[in-house]
Amino acid sequence: MSESETINVNGPSQDFSYSDSPFCMEASFSSSDLLQSETKNVKRGNESTHTFSEDIYSTEGSLLGDINLGNYPESEQNQPANTRLSSLRQFEPICKFHWIEAFNDEMTVEDLRGAFSYSEKPELPSQVYNDAADGSEKPDPFKEESSVESSISENKDELVPAPVRKSPRSLCLNYYRGEAQPLTEAPFVRSAVVDVGLNISQPQSFLDKENVCKNGDNSSDRENCFEQLDLRAIYKAEEPEVSSKEVQNSGEISELSVSHQEEVTEDGVDSLAITSPWSPAGIFKGSGPQDNSLRPDREVSCEGLEPLEEDMALNEALQKLKQTNKKQELQIQDLHGKNLNLENRVQELQTKVTKQHVLVDIINKLKVNIEELINDKYNVILEKNDINKKLQDLQEASAHTKKHLQESKKDKESLQLQVKKIKVHYVRLQERYIAEIQQKNRSASQCLEIEKTLSKKDEELQRLQRHKGELEKATSSALDLLKREKEIREQEFLSFQEEFQRREKESLKERRKLKSRVEKLVAQVKSLLFTCESERAQTMALQRQVEELKLENLELRQLAAKREAQACTPSFEITQSKEQLEEAVEPDITQETKGTHCNLFLNRSSCKENLELQPLKKTSPLASGIHSLLALRIGLLTCQDLATPDAELCQESKKANDIMLQRLKDCQLKKKDLDKELLKHKNRIATLKELIASEKALQAHTIEITDFDADEVKSARDAPVLLAVKLDKYHSLNEELDVLITKLGGLLESKEDHYSRLIEENDKYRRHVGSLINKVTSYEEIIKCADQRLEISHSQIAHLEERNRHLEDLIRMPREKAKRPRPRLDNHPKSLTLISHLEGHHKECSISL
């Protein structure tokens, strides 16, 4: 399929689903999934489309005349699921006419106004536009084009020429033959299917426009189109079966035609039963004579075979039609673009016109405003003249009034002088009267004030006496409390000093003990190091002894060889003795190397062996060294026993620290109690200060009082002196209390510092004890290493003793063999394997002899 053929195969329209022919059904099955969704949306569309299709059907019935377009109820029965589809099938014959005109290359685009100038319903074009707009609402890739067309048709009342659709002639042929040919038989059939897809992809609005445009054709033209359709259906009978191979093999063409004739004769009845409104049989479904006239033509078309040149010509015609359709589509697109440009220009012109109208309105308004302003100007000028006249009149009146005012001023001044004189006399009389009244009031008020002050002084004296007694009691109680607290604090301080001295003595004792223990441990470590060095010297001496024993063994071997040569012993006894000596020497050498390079951590099985071999060690010359090592071991154990009191001392120090912390907590609680008492004393001192301030205020008030008697003045003078003496006493007491409070605060701070120092010293002692414990643990590890070395040395000594015994036995072997052929060596379990081996070898030798 070429690119030009696939341009419009994007959104299948509903036009293809209207036909019921077999070929159309097969072509529709390939895109059934897409069509189902679209048909559902169509079912949910407006119900107005059904009424619109019925109106168009009525107009079509009036236009077509005598031609029977098919039975509407029957088409409704074929597709009851979709009412809109059944209603739109009434226009299928008109679509057939358009297809026939497309094959004849008679494509014409007519204006709806000219086509329906004689129609009975003038509202049909607007209905067509509405139907096109409804079709544009469906999900279609050509939605934008349909919307543009609808807008152009509404603005300009004209229709854009739509491309004339072609119907593949294979549809008609498939209907007559009653079978669907495969799409892969010939390339022409593929092109026909592509045409069907192109027709499907067109929007429904184009179909409606073409239907409306072609409604005005004459019935004679339609009859000619039907005849041409029948002829082309006859020609098309052989086109789906012709391929590139069949063109070369002409013999196969006749066979294919004969087979098709048989299929037509067999299935003709079924194909006639399945009629669609899009097929020619559907067009003539209602009339019987037309069907009868078609059947002989069909038989003639099946019998005769047309040449291939006509097929080629038809293909060329179809290609030309496709090209013309493409050109028309391009022209339509250009027209769409031009229409859009024109619409934009019209909108611009409309905006310009509206702007001009607005400007004209503004100019008219300005003219009216200018006229109003001119009228206002003339009115203002007239008003100004009137105002000038009124001003002149007012000036004249003001001159007359000024004269009258000057005269009245003179009269007023004379009257004012008289009034002033009268006022002066009245003021003097009033002042005399006020002075007399004030003197009377002063004398009365002074008497009342003197009485009030005397009563107040008596009350204040009584109140001061009460406060004096309360202050004396409070001061005495505060002094007693402070003395008691001072004694308690001194006792606590002495107890703390005693405890501190005791702790210092204990710490000194602990230090001395620890120093002595450390010195003892150092001496023990030195002794252990000395013992280790002595053990090393002993191991060196043992190695020397081993070397000497090796030399002795070599000498013994040489002596044994000489004796064997002299005694002429058999060869197998000599070989046995050599093998025994070699096997005895090799494990001794390996044990020596392992003993010298062994680690410090060994199993304790060697210790058990040492305990079993103690009676043997007494006989050896190294027994004295072993006894000394055991004594060192006992000393180390005693050191470990002495290390246990250190842990007890640590526990005692922890307990003492806990006791100190508890005492510190008690001291803090006591400190809080003292702070509360100090707050109470401060509150009392504040009350005393308030009383003193009130007394000072009374003194100031007494100084202001005047006009007293001599006795009252003396008592008033003596009262502040007495109060001052009392206040001095109170001040002295307060100062003493402040001094005591500061001393107590200093003592508390010093004790807190002392406690913090004690805590720091305790921390230092703990750290020192921890370091000592670490040292003790390190010494214990050193002792363990020394013990392990001792065990290693014991094991080495045991191995050396066993080796010496084994060597002695080996030396005795040749002497005993001469006396006893089978010696028993119960004391050496390792040599049993050698004896069994020697006995077996001896038996073999005896058998061979």
Curated annotation (Swiss-Prot):
- Locate the coiled-coil region(s) and give their ranges: 309-568
Tissues and organs where the protein is expressed, per its UniProt entry: Expressed in spermatids and spermatozoa. Localized to the acrosomal matrix and acrosomal granule. Predominantly expressed during postmeiotic stages of spermatogenesis.
Q: Where is the composition biased (Basic and acidic residues)?
A: 135-146
Write down what this protein is called: Cancer-associated gene 1 protein homolog
**Phylogenetic lineage:** Eukaryota, Metazoa, Chordata, Craniata, Vertebrata
Residue stretches spanning the membrane: none
Chain intervals for the UniProt region annotation (Disordered): 125-160, 241-268
Q: At the top level of its lineage, which domain of life is listed?
A: Eukaryota
Listed Polar residues bias regions: 245-259
Which Pfam family name is an example for this entry?
CAGE1
